[in-house]
């Protein structure tokens, strides 16, 4: 059984990253943060019961910039990504997403990212909590694969709940309605560039917005989504 601990204050340490949406989560009343992928993750706001019912009956937005992206591109990006993941990516088309595993040589799970295929030889891994970029660079170093590994300036935001589809259609138009489960589309909003995916881990219908140029546009997107959801 997990032991309950008394809540404590959070001290924001400069060696741990702030999300591009951090100021927005502060303004929204975030009461606690945890550290995930070396970045602060808002854990709860005013009332956890209210947040649960908002998710299951309405629509919520979440700062999940902690799902940091590992970008794999280059002539051998497909071969390399197909090697390090457990999915057969021959069955993954461009603009399709896959939930997959990264394993060590003994089959132990290193990470369980959601993979997005943006082009024939361009992939993003939206990772859970471990240093996948360093691990992948180690595999690629002095190897047979011609790949470039990096972390793009991208920050995911989740839009989840039974009313998420209506909200997304009101913002992005009817093209969102036809987006299949675990597929993606590139789009723009008020000069902001982003990848929208029909993904999420809530058990409710939902989407994720992968904002490009997130350091510049993070608060702009956050405020845009809040205003649209009123």
Locations of the language-model features?
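Acidic, proline/glycine-enriched N-terminal capping motif
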Residues: 1-102, 108
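Conserved, structured C-terminal
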Residues: 1-37, 41-43, 116-230
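Short amphipathic beta-strand starts and helix->beta connectors
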Residues: 48-57, 102-112, 141-144, 188-196
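Acidic active-site catalytic centers that drive phospho-/nucleotidyl reactions
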Residues: 63, 112, 208
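Residue-level marker for the onset of beta-strands and adjacent loop->beta junctions
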Residues: 68, 98, 111-112, 145, ...
């Amino acid at each position: 059984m997990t032991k309950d601990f008394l809540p404590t204050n959070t001290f924001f340490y400069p060696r741990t990253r702030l999300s591009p949406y951090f100021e927005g989560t502060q303004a929204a009343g975030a009461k606690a943060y945890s550290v995930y992928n070396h970045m602060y993750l808002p854990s709860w706001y005013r009332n956890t019961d209210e947040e649960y019912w908002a998710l299951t009956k309405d629509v919520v937005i979440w700062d999940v910039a902690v799902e940091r992206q590992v970008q794999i591109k280059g002539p051998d990006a497909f071969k390399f990504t197909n090697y390090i993941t457990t999915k057969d990516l021959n069955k993954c088309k461009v603009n399709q997403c896959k939930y997959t595993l990264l394993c060590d040589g003994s089959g132990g799970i290193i990470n369980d990212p959601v993979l997005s295929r943006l082009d024939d030889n361009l992939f993003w891994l939206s990772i859970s909590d471990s240093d996948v970029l360093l691990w992948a660079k180690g595999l690629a170093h002095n190897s047979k694969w011609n790949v470039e590994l990096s972390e793009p300036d991208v920050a995911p935001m989740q839009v989840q709940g039974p009313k998420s589809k209506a909200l997304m259609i009101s913002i992005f138009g009817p093209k969102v309605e036809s987006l299949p489960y675990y597929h993606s589309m590139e789009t723009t909003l008020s000069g902001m560039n982003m990848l929208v995916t029909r993904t999420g881990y809530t058990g409710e219908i939902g989407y994720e917005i992968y904002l490009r140029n997130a350091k510049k546009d993070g608060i702009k997107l956050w405020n845009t989504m809040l205003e649209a959801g009123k």
